[in-house]
């Protein structure tokens, strides 16, 4: 099923949002109580959590990858902790990209595991224990800011500068995962991604509370020249428009754009339609690294696996990385987590 955030989430207060406000009030109370929980498991190593205040994508995974690479450069042994959204694995599992597929562990853990050991678990505290057994000396949580299952030494909250906090309402009336007040109490640093101005109110709120505000940009890695190419762009991510914006910046002519739900496996029919439409209109197929991970997951069983691999072979994959405006930021984040961990012992 295709799931995208409703448009009224990103508009001023509207009738649908106001009609849903009573449900949002209840959801917000529950979410705030959960975030105030005091029974968090305290791992024997520092923990950095990469989260966001809203539902959907903001750049958490690229941020987590950037921090892990910085940790490796510092001589540390980082490991990722994920719930493996979209996968079937529930017990703590060390991700093996050569064995597991997106159907098993989700798409994002496959990307994370290409850089550092990655454990998926339905219960984050169990996953943290598994990472400790693996000899990890720094845990990086991809999401989980609102869960309060694990003691966090440094919480970096990522926000999209083009969307900010939307209409400011908690789900389902808006995109917020919990009331902003409790989220800002718990975060340590606010990371604003991009050059938009929708996050300015959040930046001001953070400044009033003395929260450091970091800035960064998503940049595509070097790849094939797309300038002037007529493309069919397809993406099953939380914010396909972000991907399309990157393609336009690379000079691609997006003739057809096909958006699918975040973490949504492509059906055999959808795969066939993409291939056939691109061939009929003489378009180049272009997709994201997350979609590449899902398509690779079709290599084992399931209808249409041959077409899935055909689609992947015909697609140009655009990989991105998080570039901090201040290159020293990743090391500072890691240092803060280590310092707070030592003080808590």
From Swiss-Prot:
Chain residues that bind ATP: 54-61
Any one GO MF annotation of this record: ATP binding
Pathway: Glycolipid biosynthesis; lipid IV(A) biosynthesis; lipid IV(A) from (3R)-3-hydroxytetradecanoyl-[acyl-carrier-protein] and UDP-N-acetyl-alpha-D-glucosamine: step 6/6
Gene Ontology biological process terms, A to Z: lipid A biosynthetic process; lipopolysaccharide core region biosynthetic process
EC number: 2.7.1.130
Superkingdom assignment: Bacteria
Disulfide bonds: none
Any single Gene Ontology cellular-component annotation: plasma membrane
Function: Transfers the gamma-phosphate of ATP to the 4'-position of a tetraacyldisaccharide 1-phosphate intermediate (termed DS-1-P) to form tetraacyldisaccharide 1,4'-bis-phosphate (lipid IVA).
Family named by the database record: Belongs to the LpxK family.
Protein name: Tetraacyldisaccharide 4'-kinase
Species this chain originates from: Allorhizobium ampelinum (strain ATCC BAA-846 / DSM 112012 / S4)
């Amino acid at each position: 099923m295709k799931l995208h955030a409703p448009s009224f989430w990103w508009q001023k207060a509207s009738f649908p949002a106001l009609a849903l406000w009573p449900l949002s009030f209840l959801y917000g109370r529950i979410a705030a109580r959960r975030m105030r929980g005091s029974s968090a498991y305290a791992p024997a190593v520092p923990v950095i959590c990469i989260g966001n205040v809203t539902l959907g994508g903001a750049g958490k995974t690229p941020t987590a990858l950037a921090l892990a690479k910085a940790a490796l450069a510092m001589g540390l042994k980082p490991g990722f902790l994920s719930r493996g959204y979209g996968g079937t694995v529930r017990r703590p599992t060390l991700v093996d990209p050569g064995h597991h597929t997106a159907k098993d562990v989700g798409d994002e853990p496959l990307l994370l595991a290409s850089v550092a050991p990655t454990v998926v678990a339905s219960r984050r505290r169990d996953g943290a224990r598994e990472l400790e057994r693996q000899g990890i000396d720094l845990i990086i949580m991809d999401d989980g800011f609102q869960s309060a299952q694990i003691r966090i030494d440094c919480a970096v909250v990522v926000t999209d500068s083009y969307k900010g906090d939307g209409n400011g309402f908690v789900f389902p009336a808006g995109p917020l995962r919990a009331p902003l007040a409790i989220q800002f109490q718990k975060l340590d640093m606010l990371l604003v991604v991009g050059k938009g101005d929708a996050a300015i109110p959040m930046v001001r709120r953070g400044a009033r509370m003395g929260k450091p505000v970091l800035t960064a940009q998503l940049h595509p890695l070097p790849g094939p020249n797309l300038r002037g190419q007529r493309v069919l762009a397809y993406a099953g991510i939380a914010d396909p428009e972000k991907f399309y914006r990157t393609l336009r910046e690379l000079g691609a002519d997006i003739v057809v754009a096909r958006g699918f739900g975040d973490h949504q496996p492509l059906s055999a029919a959808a795969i066939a339609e993409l291939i056939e439409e691109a061939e009929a209109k003489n378009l180049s197929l272009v997709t994201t690294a997350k979609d590449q991970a899902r398509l690779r997951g079709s290599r084992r069983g399931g209808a249409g696996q041959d077409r899935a691999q055909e689609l992947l072979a015909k697609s140009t994959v655009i990989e991105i990385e998080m570039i901090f405006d201040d290159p020293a930021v990743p090391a500072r984040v890691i240092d803060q987590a280590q310092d707070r961990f030592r003080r808590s012992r």
